[in-house]
Amino acid sequence: MLEKVVIANRGEIALRILRACKELGIKTVAVHSTADRDLKHVLLADETICIGPAPSAKSYLNIPAIIAAAEVTGADAIHPGYGFLSENADFAEQVERSGFTFIGPTADVIRLMGDKVSAIKAMKKAGVPCVPGSDGPVSNDIAKNKEIAKRIGYPIIIKASGGGGGRGMRVVRSEDALEESIAMTKAEAKAAFNNDMVYMEKYLENPRHVEIQVLADTHGNAVYLAERDCSMQRRHQKVVEEAPAPGITEEVRRDIGSRCANACVEIGYRGAGTFEFLYENGEFYFIEMNTRIQVEHPVTEMITGVDLVKEQLRIAAGLPISFKQEDIKVKGHAMECRINAEDPKTFLPSPGKVNHLHSPGGLGVRWDSHVYGGYTVPPHYDSMIAKLITYGDTREVAIRRMQNALSETIIDGIKTNIPLHELILEDENFQKGGTNIHYLEKKLGMNE
């Protein structure tokens, strides 16, 4: 087993990693910025090292400082958590080159899955369903383009190869508009990105966001741990997550889950990972793979009984996964609300001192947070201050428990988005289950 781990992160995930290390008897090193001296995990770690000033670029993204911290403390591994350097292939490479274990996949796999084109190619090869498309840029041959569009099926979306941020995209609903739309998107792409290459993809009108949790070890084993539904989003940021996803049968779960597990073996994956899909009309379409632990991992832990962070540590130590696929049984239902220090109406961050905190409790209630009474939420980082997770035998029980838990929570001194969560949980369509990724923004009157 690993002997000493550097926790290269902050906030609730750093505390989550510390708890798993302690349970496994692993010593911990907390690296922190000058703004984070009073973080809960910093107060609890075996050793602490300040790695720089408050801005992330000078601390949590400071690769030489993090590796130096591992060297001076005699650590044998570094856990990147999520965000920051967790999906930075250069960091993973430098960690391993410096003689430490990176708790995550290899740098090559992070690179492969971090590039959209190579990731989709690898997934198609491994039998994971992807969004049907033109398999590369379209030509000027309109007859051929019409043929491709017909094969994909309308509506389609034309995207600029060099595009991003919502620019250089056009939805086409019929063949009549195809030629003109391609020409217009090409012209836009040339003007905006100096690259007029465009490609076609099937346009999904009202998809849900469904993702599959996987674990893979260095002994050729890979397992899937059911799915999560993260469709309740605002500005592409997940707000509420749940597991399992409403309406997904065991048969469907087994099919898509085993494809993801097989893909892990194909690409030589190791550690915890998540395959993200758009799900519409009973079909899954791969969008990307997250090569790290995710914010919403607790809902999977609640329904499977697996400690995902402990498995990450075991795998990094060279041990096989501690269970087999057939041992995994989905039981009950779990929900997670991301509690942010922000104004519930304007969504602007609300840093400051937490004068008083009362966290909820009771059967099936889990509170993952680094915040305590007297703690000051700094303005430099992500606004998430807690994750409230509830579990019940049924989805209805999990929702009711979440409503109770939210009403019990007292966070005095700063504003939080708890009113937004209360609004979502009492929404009739959310209670039925299966709302799509646009639902919350439409409800908030945000659809642009």
From Swiss-Prot:
Binding-site positions, ATP: K116, K159, G165, G166, E201, K202, Y203, L204, H209, H236, E276, E288
Q: Residue ranges of the ATP-grasp domain?
A: 120-317
- UniProt lists the gene as accC
Q: Where does the record place the catalytic residues?
A: R292
Query: Which reaction is recorded as catalysed by this protein?
Result: N(6)-biotinyl-L-lysyl-[protein] + hydrogencarbonate + ATP = N(6)-carboxybiotinyl-L-lysyl-[protein] + ADP + phosphate + H(+)
The UniProt record gives the binding positions of biotin as R338
Q: Which residues bind Mg(2+) 2?
A: E288, N290
Which segment of the chain is annotated as a signal peptide? none
| Residues annotated for Mn(2+) 1 binding in this entry | E276, E288
Question: Its quaternary structure?
Answer: Acetyl-CoA carboxylase is a heterohexamer of biotin carboxyl carrier protein, biotin carboxylase and the two subunits of carboxyl transferase in a 2:2 complex.
* Positions of transmembrane segments: none
- Output this protein's name: Biotin carboxylase
Q: Taxonomic lineage per UniProt?
A: Bacteria, Pseudomonadati, Pseudomonadota, Gammaproteobacteria, Pasteurellales
Keyword Transmembrane listed? The answer is no
Q: Name one GO biological process term.
A: malonyl-CoA biosynthetic process
Q: What is its EC number?
A: 6.3.4.14
